[in-house]
From Swiss-Prot:
<comment type="similarity">
    <text>Belongs to the UPF0194 family.</text>
</comment>
<keyword id="KW-0175">Coiled coil</keyword>
<keyword id="KW-0574">Periplasm</keyword>
<dbReference type="InterPro" id="IPR032317">
    <property type="entry name" value="CusB_D23"/>
</dbReference>
<dbReference type="GO" id="GO:0042597">
    <property type="term" value="C:periplasmic space"/>
</dbReference>
<keyword id="KW-0732">Signal</keyword>
<dbReference type="Pfam" id="PF16576">
    <property type="entry name" value="HlyD_D23"/>
</dbReference>
<feature type="signal peptide">
    <location>
        <begin position="1"/>
        <end position="15"/>
    </location>
</feature>
<dbReference type="InterPro" id="IPR022936">
    <property type="entry name" value="UPF0194_membrane_YbhG"/>
</dbReference>
<dbReference type="InterPro" id="IPR050465">
    <property type="entry name" value="UPF0194_transport"/>
</dbReference>
<protein>
    <recommendedName>
        <fullName>UPF0194 membrane protein YbhG</fullName>
    </recommendedName>
</protein>
<feature type="coiled-coil region">
    <location>
        <begin position="107"/>
        <end position="208"/>
    </location>
</feature>
């Protein structure tokens, strides 16, 4: 073969390779990035925050539930009684606090003053009697025991007088700040116990936290539950999230707010629409559940994609193909 012919063939082959590479690159650009993921499985165990006997359950397995819907109730009676006791405790503490703030009435002060006069008279009598007994003791008219009895009576009367004087002084000056503060603290404690009793009564009714589908019903009416015991397991149906993974090469395309198309095997020609809501800040090895064997050993970043037009056909755990491209649009 002549040399010019060989050179010509080489040029043709090289041109074909370049053209093929360009076509492949261009097709990749046109088609955009494709990722694979699954609809997130989101379940929650529902329980009463308080314990008690299950009075009634309003739903069964497979039922659709709405946020705020009553799902079950415990026997309310113990919590209603506790609430009544807490209300009574607040009333007592409030009355005591009000008394502390108001101080003492004029009638109480007058009674305390009269008690001081009576105690003073008793002390004066006891002191005079003791003085006389001392004179008799010196003249050896009475025994030492008689003198000691007189001294004891005098000391007791003196203590009674001091107590009455202190009480009158307190009545006239009002309650001490420490006593008022203690009464206020007792009132606040009673109010906190009332709030707790109200919350316990409220929590004896189980309410759905969000829309979903009931997967399991773990107990039946009549069951006595501890607080936190699982009653239902619920699959959360809204919002619908798709979990996918992107490698570092394509991370710049998967920015929060980016719109994507979501394809399922059941409707390959009618995609759902989604928007990237979260990109993990840390890399991880691709989970085995991802349908991309070539990426399973790579370090990737987890994406959460919010499906904006989800319907009941998009079920949790379903494999999804995530398509990036101009047709998906950008934020």
């Amino acid at each position: 073969m002549k040399k010019p012919v060989v050179i010509g063939l080489a040029v043709v082959v090289l041109a074909a390779v370049v053209a093929g590479g360009y076509w492949w690159y261009q097709s990749r650009q046109d088609n955009g990035l494709t990722l694979y993921g699954n609809v997130d499985i989101r379940t929650v165990n529902l329980s009463f925050r308080v314990g008690g006997r299950v009075e009634s359950l309003a739903v069964d397995e497979g039922d659709a539930i709405k946020a705020g819907q009553v799902l079950g109730e415990l026997d309310h009676k113990p919590y209603e009684i506790a609430l009544m006791q807490a209300k009574a405790g607040v009333s007592v503490a409030q009355a005591q606090y009000d008394l502390m703030l108001a101080g003492y009435r004029d009638e109480e002060i007058a009674q305390a003053a009269a008690a001081v006069k009576q105690a003073q008279a008793a002390y004066d009598y006891a002191q005079n009697f003791y003085n006389r007994q001392q004179g008799l003791w010196k003249s050896r008219t009475i025994s030492a025991n008689d003198l000691e009895n007189a001294r004891s009576s005098r000391d007791q009367a003196q203590a009674t007088l001091k107590s009455a004087q202190d009480k009158l002084r307190q009545y006239r000056s009002g309650n001490r700040e420490q006593d008022i503060a203690q009464a206020k603290a007792s009132l606040e404690q009673a109010q906190a116990q009332l709030a707790q009793a109200e919350l316990n009564l409220q929590d004896s009714t189980l309410v759905a936290p969000s829309d979903g589908t009931l997967l399991t019903r773990a107990v039946e009416p009549g069951t006595v539950l501890n607080e936190g015991g699982t009653v239902f397991t619920v699959s959360l149906t809204r919002p619908v999230w798709v979990r996918a993974y992107v490698d570092e090469r394509n991370l710049d395309q998967a920015q929060p707010g980016r719109k994507v198309l979501l394809y399922t095997d059941g409707r390959p020609n009618k995609p759902y629409h989604g928007q990237i809501g979260f990109v993990s800040p840390t890399a991880e090895f691709t989970p085995k559940t991802v349908e991309t064997p070539d990426l399973r050993t790579d370090l990737v970043y987890r994406l959460r994609i919010v499906v904006t037009d989800a319907d009941d056909a998009l079920r949790q755990g379903m494999p999804v193909t995530v398509q990036f491209g101009d047709e998906a649009g950008h934020e």
